[in-house]
């Protein structure tokens, strides 16, 4: 279910790290447990292994919403073929061009083109140009400017972008969409539901029963038994298919959201944000590091632009793009630098569009919890099958020895006196009972419950500003023990403004008071701001305020530049950019070399970045009058004092410096791409302090995490003083005087040995001046210590840490596409409070699954014991096939819907994280389950054996008395499940009604179940072998079921040991003990 772009890299990104899901059945299992798979990047062999681990009765039903391994292989084959085809075409053109390298080329006229709805070039010609990387054709069209003219595009201002222009371009060159394979139809889900082996057997039994019933009793009375079983099976099939189909539609919608990338385009001279689907041929698109190339196109201009084309070519090679290699392919990622491109082909006309149209997106996904529950289902299924076979043997033995009786008390089988039809009908009845026991005993609804709760949670999380890219992240988030959060934009508002400035050797007050500076230093500052930026300024012709675009830091600096009197476009035209060193989060600075317009030889190299890092490279500084002075130790101390003062006020400190250079020393244009900009002997211009306010509510969110047993750690590129001030403001630090290792600098952490790093990682609350690699080292150290780590990130260099973490959380607003594709969840509003809401939902997923397990196993145990004991002792079962199918429907589908959609509560954030290797069935669940199951078994078996006298039916004839008694047992059993559903909502809370009015679906399902039960008992007796009950018996039935509530209340007062029950069994059994030890060792040495 990952986004289109990430799906191509799935196979390459597989890895076998990350802790798995833990034991399948309590503590059952070993280090080689096939049902224990990693949460991220599980090897294909592991995924194949668990499917073959044990007897699986209903594979088609069991493996719903798990990874379709065969389809994954087919998808890879399709991708490989399309890549190979593209390779051949491009190789042919390159070979042709290589032969022309030493041939003197004459001026070639542009080939004849036919106008396309008023444009100077046709769709197929434009598509072929970029698809084939045909540089010769580009030159014949007049280069990039010629193609732009044909597309009626201004390379500076873009297209006009009005509705008529966009419509004309879509009509001429297509839209940036591609035909998607339709999702599976409802009929396909119906067919899958029909493949359930036990249901097939029941349908066969229904057909045989129908035929024999009509033969022996006539059509008027003989069709009831067979038809009622068939109808019950059909109902199960329809409800199952409907539920699956609904979940499928939800996942499709979420998949659409994941692919709907927002990007900037230049239209009418201004940068605006549009959906990737709204892109048209002729659009001018700015590109920066981490962006996905949104369509095929040609590079207009770029600086140090490198592109990762591995998603299209399959080769992990970074390709440099310039005027000699200008073709950009849709779907590729910008690895470095920035530039602008002209869109030439969109949608299905691109290689990416063809690729996406050829593969299916909805490939399913494995989640550890799904696999663990499949392990539980397999174990219980084997027990159920064994019991059903035992019941079958016992009933057949009793039948053929004359120990089974008809409702009127007569013997069912008398040797030599029974016809073949009657004998077969009796055997079919017995066989149906045994198969139905399997239906009830095998909890196929467990994996479905995971899908239901995940789909529900994902839909609700969208409203809470979180887009889930990987299903298993939902459940893993519930186990998170630590969150490593960025500062900027996550803990802060990302609304930056320059509030302090130190230029010319003194503080400017206010910070835009340019009058204190000479014209020479002012022009240098403005030149450095305008040229050394990836942002832009649009100046409206009507005199309105300029529109500033770019990253928050760039916008703050550009806005400050405007206050200094900077005219952005004029300043940029006064000098030309020779080379750019894009801002790098490792080096924490960016630079640009510009050739001054009025001089043939003078070059300025401007640097901007972290204040103390720029300061270390400066040998001199400029005074307010423009005079140059050496950087003395006293002056360095003065600068450092100003930096510390700003940092103590939680300001981000950015320094500006420059140096002069000679044009003769600048490398020639063909070698300039490898030029390393000089960063020594710099001249300090000054420092600005940028304020980024702390987000409202962050302190409360951090406090909530602490109460939930989750430690929040701040990892930032800012210096330690700024980091300390923000951490105190956000509540991450409580003591301003803490020292290492609680607050540590990235380089200090980096210098530690592996063992020291692990020990320090436990204590770290704040890491300042950290690089993306430091964040990665912190994540690895924490995971080695057994933590389940969630990490936030927005930059391209954050991708390794996001991928390494148990849960990678990227930012939806400031995050790059590379970061988003390496993440598991996208935080759409970049807000830390949304991260905490994701934790709540993660815990809710796990809690809801446990509620459903408790509820379902109670039904399993009670139904099995009642029918087995009754069958063995009397030869008859109180709950027949149709009744058990109805119970199965309540339990598997309606129960899953009711309990899997419980919204998260504050109670979830008042307990520690759930360990992923903790048993799925806790001691609290065992206690509740045993109490409820015992209560139901005792009550219903008492009714089975003493019901006639207890219900005062002795005066009735035997057949009617038995029918009333069995109906009463069936009715009480179903009502017990209804009342127990309320108990299951709050397994460890006394108030089971808390928040119940907020869950409308739960209330609706309970109401529907009760109404249908009343209809079945009162009006559908012919089909279900029941009879109408008096209102007195209804009251008694409700009273017995109601007793579940006070019993559960008292039961919850019984304390349970903290140690899992499985450990007690392991202590008693040497083999189990070894297995448990092995599992413990595995946990210690895994990446959990």
Curated annotation (Swiss-Prot):
Its EC number is 7.2.2.10. SMART domains: Cation_ATPase_N. It is an enzyme of class 7 (translocase). The chain crosses the membrane at residues 199-219, 222-242, 339-359, 376-396, 426-446, 852-872, 881-901, 920-940, 1001-1021, 1031-1051. GO terms for molecular function: ATP binding; ATP hydrolysis activity; calmodulin binding; metal ion binding; P-type calcium transporter activity. Residues 1-198, 243-338, 397-425, 873-880, 941-1000, 1052-1088 are cytoplasmic. PANTHER family: CALCIUM-TRANSPORTING ATPASE, CATION TRANSPORTING ATPASE. This is Calcium-transporting ATPase 5, plasma membrane-type.
């Amino acid at each position: 279910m990952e986004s289109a772009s990430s799906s191509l890299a799935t196979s390459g990104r597989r890895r076998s790290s990350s802790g798995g899901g833990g034991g399948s059945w309590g503590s059952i299992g070993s280090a080689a447990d096939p049902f224990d798979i990693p949460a991220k990047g599980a090897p294909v062999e592991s995924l194949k292994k668990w499917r073959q681990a044990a007897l699986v009765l209903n594979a088609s039903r069991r493996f719903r919403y798990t990874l379709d391994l065969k389809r994954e292989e087919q998808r890879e084959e399709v991708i490989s073929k399309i890549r190979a085809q593209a390779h051949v075409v491009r190789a042919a053109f390159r070979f042709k061009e290589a032969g022309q390298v030493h041939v003197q080329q004459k001026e070639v006229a542009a080939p004849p083109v036919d106008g396309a709805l008023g444009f100077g070039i046709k769709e197929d010609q434009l598509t072929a140009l970029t698809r084939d990387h045909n540089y010769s054709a580009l030159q014949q069209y007049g280069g990039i400017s010629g193609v732009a003219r044909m597309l009626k595009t201004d390379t500076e201002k873009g297209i006009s972008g009005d509705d008529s222009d966009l419509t004309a371009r879509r009509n001429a060159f297509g839209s940036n969409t591609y035909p998607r394979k339709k999702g599976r139809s409802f009929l396909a889900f119906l067919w899958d539901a029909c493949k359930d082996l036990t249901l097939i057997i029941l349908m066969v039994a229904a057909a045989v029963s129908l035929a024999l019933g009509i033969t022996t009793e006539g059509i008027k009375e003989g069709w009831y038994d067979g038809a009622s079983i068939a109808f019950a099976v059909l109902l199960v099939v329809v409800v199952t298919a409907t539920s699956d189909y609904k979940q499928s539609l939800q996942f499709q919608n979420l998949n659409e959201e994941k692919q709907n990338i927002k990007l900037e385009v230049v239209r009418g001279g201004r940068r605006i944000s549009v959906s990737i689907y709204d892109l048209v041929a002729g659009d001018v698109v700015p590109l920066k590091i981490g962006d996905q190339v949104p369509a095929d196109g040609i590079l207009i201009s770029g600086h140090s632009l490198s592109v990762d084309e591995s998603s299209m070519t399959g080769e992990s090679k970074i390709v440099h793009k310039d005027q000699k290699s200008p073709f950009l392919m849709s779907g590729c990622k910008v690895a470095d630098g920035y530039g602008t491109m002209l869109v030439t082909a969109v949608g299905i006309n691109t290689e990416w569009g063809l690729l996406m149209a050829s593969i299916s997106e909805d490939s399913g996904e494995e989640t550890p919890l799904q696999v663990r529950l499949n392990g539980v289902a397999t174990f219980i299924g084997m027990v159920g099958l064994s019991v059903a076979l035992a019941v079958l043997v016992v009933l057949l033995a009793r039948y053929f020895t004359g120990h089974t009786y008809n409702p009127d008390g007569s013997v069912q089988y008398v040797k030599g006196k029974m016809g073949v039809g009657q004998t077969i009908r009796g055997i079919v009845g017995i066989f149906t009972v045994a198969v139905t026991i399997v239906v009830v005993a095998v909890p196929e609804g467990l994996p479905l419950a995971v899908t239901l709760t995940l789909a529900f949670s994902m839909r609700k999380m969208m409203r809470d500003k979180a887009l889930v890219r990987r299903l298993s992240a939902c459940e893993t988030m519930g186990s998170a023990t630590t969150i490593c959060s960025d500062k900027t934009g996550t803990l802060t508002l990302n609304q930056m403004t320059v509030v302090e400035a130190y230029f010319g050797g003194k503080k400017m007050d206010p910070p835009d008071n340019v009058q204190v500076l000479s014209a020479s230093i002012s022009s240098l500052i403005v030149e450095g701001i305008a040229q050394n930026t990836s942002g832009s300024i649009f100046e409206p012709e009507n005199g309105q305020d300029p529109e500033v675009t770019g990253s928050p830091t760039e916008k703050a600096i550009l806005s400050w530049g405007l206050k200094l009197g900077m005219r952005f476009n004029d300043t940029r035209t006064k000098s030309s950019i020779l080379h750019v060193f894009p801002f790098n989060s490792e080096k924490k600075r960016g630079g640009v070399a510009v050739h001054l317009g009025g001089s043939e030889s003078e070059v300025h190299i401007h640097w901007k970045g972290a204040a103390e890092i720029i300061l270390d490279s400066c040998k001199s500084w400029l005074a307010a009058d423009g005079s140059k002075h050496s950087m003395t130790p006293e002056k360095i101390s003065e600068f450092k004092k100003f930096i510390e003062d700003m940092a103590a006020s939680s300001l981000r400190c950015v320094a500006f410096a420059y140096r002069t250079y000679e044009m003769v020393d600048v490398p020639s244009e063909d070698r300039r791409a490898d030029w390393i900009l000089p960063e020594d002997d710099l001249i300090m211009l000054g420092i600005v302090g940028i304020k980024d306010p702390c987000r409202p509510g962050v302190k409360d969110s951090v406090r909530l995490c602490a109460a939930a047993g989750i430690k929040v750690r701040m990892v930032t590129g800012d210096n330690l003083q700024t980091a300390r001030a923000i951490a105190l403001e956000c509540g991450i630090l409580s003591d301003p005087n803490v020292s290492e290792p609680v607050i540590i600098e990235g380089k200090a952490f980096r210098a530690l040995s592996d063992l020291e790093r692990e020990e320090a990682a436990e204590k770290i609350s704040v890491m300042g001046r950290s690089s993306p690699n430091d964040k990665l080292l912190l994540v690895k150290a924490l995971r080695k210590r057994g933590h389940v780590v969630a990490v936030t990130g927005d930059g391209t260099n954050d991708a390794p840490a996001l991928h390494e973490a148990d849960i990678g959380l990227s930012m939806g607003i400031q995050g790059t596409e590379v970061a988003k594709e390496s993440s598991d969840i996208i935080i759409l509003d970049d807000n830390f409070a949304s991260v905490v809401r994701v934790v709540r939902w993660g815990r809710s997923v796990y809690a809801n699954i446990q509620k459903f397990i408790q509820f379902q196993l109670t039904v399993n145990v009670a139904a099995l014991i009642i029918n087995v004991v009754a069958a063995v002792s009397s030869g008859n079962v109180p709950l027949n096939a149709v009744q058990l199918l109805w119970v199965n429907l309540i339990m598997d589908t309606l129960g899953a819907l009711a309990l899997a959609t419980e919204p998260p509560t504050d109670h979830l954030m008042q307990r520690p994280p759930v360990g992923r290797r903790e048993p799925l069935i806790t001691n609290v669940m065992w206690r509740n389950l045993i109490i409820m199951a015992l209560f139901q078994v005792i009550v219903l078996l008492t009714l089975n054996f003493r019901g006639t006298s207890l219900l005062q039916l002795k005066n009735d004839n035997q057949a009617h008395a038995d029918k009333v008694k069995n109906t009463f047992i069936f009715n009480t059993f179903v009502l017990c499940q209804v009342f127990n559903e309320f108990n299951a909502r709050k397994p460890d809370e006394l108030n089971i009604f808390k928040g119940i009015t907020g869950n409308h679906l739960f209330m609706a399902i309970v109401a529907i179940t009760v109404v249908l039960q009343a209809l079945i008992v009162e009006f559908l007796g012919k089909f279900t072998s029941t009879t109408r009950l008096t209102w007195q018996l209804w009251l008694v039935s409700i009273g017995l079921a109601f007793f579940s509530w006070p019993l559960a209340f008292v039961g919850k007062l019984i304390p349970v040991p903290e140690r899992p029950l499985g450990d007690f069994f392991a202590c008693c059994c040497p083999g189990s003990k070894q297995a448990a030890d092995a599992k413990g060792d595995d946990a210690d040495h895994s990446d959990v």
